[in-house]
From Swiss-Prot:
It comes from Caenorhabditis elegans. This is Intracellular phospholipase A2. Disruption phenotype: Mutant animals generate fewer progeny and slower larval development. SUPFAM superfamilies: Ankyrin repeat, FabD/lysophospholipase-like. It is an enzyme of class 3 (hydrolase). PANTHER family: 85_88 KDA CALCIUM-INDEPENDENT PHOSPHOLIPASE A2, CALCIUM-INDEPENDENT PHOSPHOLIPASE A2. Belongs to the patatin family. One of its GO terms (biological process) is response to starvation. The keyword Lipid metabolism applies.
Amino acid sequence: MTTTNKDGPFRQQYLPGVHKEPNLAISESTHSSDWYSATSSEDCFQAASQSFSSQKSNGNVITQQPGKLHCEISDPKSCSFVPAISTDNAQMGTSGIIKYRSYSNPDLLVAMSPLAYRDEAPQSQKSVANSRQDLTQTSCEVVTVSETVVNADSITTTTVTSSTTTTATASQEDFIMVEAEQDETAGLCDATMPLVDKKNITTSSTTSSPSRQITPRIENGLSFENVVSLVKIFPAFVNKLLKKPWYASRCDEVCQFPKAELAYYDIVSTDVDDEHFVIVAGKVTTDEHLMDNQFHLVFAPVGFSEDVSLDERPFSLFRATDKKDLMDLLHLCDEKSFLFTSLDMSTMRADILRSKIEELVIQIRLKPHYHMIHVAIATDRLDFFSDGMIKTMNETLEPFESQLRCLCHTENCYPVHLALTMDRQKIVERLLELDPTLFCETDKAGNNVWHHVNSSFCAQIIWDRCPASQHFIDERNMDGQSPLNEAVSTAKPLVATFLIGKGAKFTRGDRNELFVAMTSKNAQSVVEVVLTDKPEIANERDALGNSAIHVALYKESLNALLNRKVELGLDIDVKNNAGETALLLFITTRKPDLLPLLVTLYAHGANMNATDPHGNTALHKSAALVDAKKISLECVKFLISAGSNPNKINLRGESPRHLAASLQNQEMLAILKAAGATRCPKGYKGCRSNCRHDCSSAEDEYEETLQKIRIGNESDYEKTEFTASEKLNIQDTLDGSRRGKKAKVNLISMDGGGIRGLVIIQTLIAIEERLGDDIFKYFDWSAGTSTGSLIMAGLATGKSLREMQQTYLLLKDRVFDGIMPPYDTVQLEKFIQDQFGTGTVWEIPYPRLMISAVNSEKLPVRLEMARNYKPAKDVAPETPKEMPLWMALRRSTAAPVLFKPSEDRYIDGGIISNNPALDLMSEVHAYNRELQLSGRKSDAVQMNVLVSFGTGQIPSTVIETLSIDSNSPLQSIKTIKNLAAMFIDQATASEGAPVARSRQWADSLEIPFFRFSAPLSKNIFLSSTSDLDVCTMMWDSFIYCRKHRDYIDELVKVLKHDTDHPHVKTPFTDL
């Protein structure tokens, strides 16, 4: 006979996602009446009596003591099932005890005395959910047929016989779910189970808890969940059968080590001293277990050991066959280890824990430049911002206040802006509690919180909880976009609706006239007119503290403004409210004319190593932005060529190389390594293999990088190397075998070449860095032609090499500013006077100068030299004492076609002496002979070294034909053109034969000879105004000097060997 009640038949119901069948779980909201088959003890007794005989025949009767509730449990470690008791399967024992057995799980038997039920009936109607104390009054007895006693406080094993009972009084904690043990093979079990009210469980129920779907069991058959579990277990079974690895096939999928596998791995030695993060490798191979040939990056909560408990097993974060691939990630994870160790592993479900760890690893790999707080926001770790976590970080890590203002380099914003952009609503609320002033700050591009907000929810809570931020609702960013403009342009309709509802406008009002002109193309004339009419507005600032220099978008307008910076009292390195100079701001904001803007700023004297409040230079910002294609590599090359320090570190101890290595940008890394960027110091955390201290030596690394950089076809260029006789001359000089009573003088010669004079300057800068001192004071006699004379005069008048570099960048825009030659001669003369003054040549006391020019008044043309000393009487007449220096320079730079002749007769000295090295040596020889003939041989000087500087070697070109054919006029024209180019090339030659002659003459005198002339990747015309061409030429020269450091070092040895240099007094005697 079967008895049913209103709760339906007795069934076992379990939760989806749990593949292992547990046997008993009591819900927090379960009524005690739900565990009985009827509403009265009489019903219970009757039902039991009617089924007693059939139960007895099956041999399943267990003798119980009256007044106790008994449960027979076969596997107490598994507890997903929620039993609903029915009288359908109630059975009566010999002692009058009712026992209930499940349809689907015959191992589960619930037995209770009807007398006990009658005694407890009134109290049993109370809900456990309302008061757990009700259930604590009931004494329960568990018959442990399977030798295990289950208690929610603890699980203990007790060996008993079938007649032995263990009695325990239920406590409040007895009525919770018992956590299911995870299956090691499949790894698919949920770590925790929610509490379920039995009354909400029916055969047709679709929900049992807010987050889980309950699937009814099919009577006398497999449930859907059993089928799912079998499907999930099947691949693991096949893998084990086929001896496939236990971990996932994807190398970046986080997997927890099965306990049985821990014994087969050993820890690999690394430079990271943190037991939580280790690299392990397989160590043994057996018939049953093949050795794992992959390295595993492991997160071990309590260390990597086979003795750990199931809940503390390590996680394999990443796998690779090459240990080096894991080292970078190891250092990154170690730097952010707090994010892993702070996870609440004791209460978190296993699948959720794995998911959170995997999300951390993904973010760290994708965003290696992120600091800890940025990763916490990206992974939505609200617990990171809790009071306990903050206290721990303040005591053991970087202060939390410092982290809140830690700049995110690629996004160029702060954590609060990142949280708004990613719409981390809970984190935003927490930040409002911690420090509302964060929401009044702008990022480096001038965006405030209203620009970043991505949901109306965040917008509303900011509006309500931070009233101060309401004042910025119409503030524009660096691009002139208001928050409402931004919301509309980025398709955020709900945010746009919110802003409009709060009174936001599309525009805040125009800036002053100068600001408008600075953002307009080809508006240089407008800038000049505005400054002439209202010079006072040149120093005005906008709401973000930006000056007119900061907002410039085009080179022409910026040049027009900075040309009057001295007159207007402008500071080119002035900082805005964010603490950034115009240079730093240009790097981080996408300017349409970035490279020309950078060149213009440097030409006018901008500090290339200026820092923001975080200590970041332009190179730091570039290293973070190159990967995002926000800045070109040409800009980076220019910054380095212009003096940006590749080894400067910011306030966090990060160098540009560290940031580039974090992003694994190989091109950027190659540039920095070629520039001499060093690795991070030993012990610095978060380094990847390209910046860690434990790798190859610096010199080997530099050489390897430089060897890979090729400029043109090497066979086209003369090599910078010593001949055997030159090595001997240098050795004799350093050994002192050429000692004598004569004063030794160092000679320097500079070729002509227009704008390519930048090659000479870049080379001199490299030598000066190795010398560690002002190089020009080590030379006693100098000669220069055309652009070489400008450099020589600038250094002689006290300019530094960097100032001369800036002068040349100004020259190309001010002097070569026409569409085509001839260029404005008046502008050239004015520029020379502005840069070198109006003093005379004779006012420069030292060193001796020779400035070449060609007098073209009659044929044959004559080479004339402007000097600041009296030459030998048979060489040339004395230069007039009143000759201005600018006039001598004007004569020497009067390149035919490009400029009108000076005084209608003087043209560029390069026509005859484009490489004045031979003329310089001739001048010294004539001086000594004059003294010898006048009986003052002891006053003669001895040449100590000759250094010749060229303006770069251009790539070779093929001459098609040199034959003139009267039957082919076109060919004849080509021939004439080729002959003209050849004649001009040889007339102005500074490479080839002139260098060979100088080298041989110096060798005959046993004088060390050095020749510097960088190979250029393209032919740069001497009047080129292209910023890209100029920057390429500067970089080619920079790389040339880096490749020939040994050659430069030999020159430095020779210059420093003579203790008389620099001379305290002149070694020369008047003739």
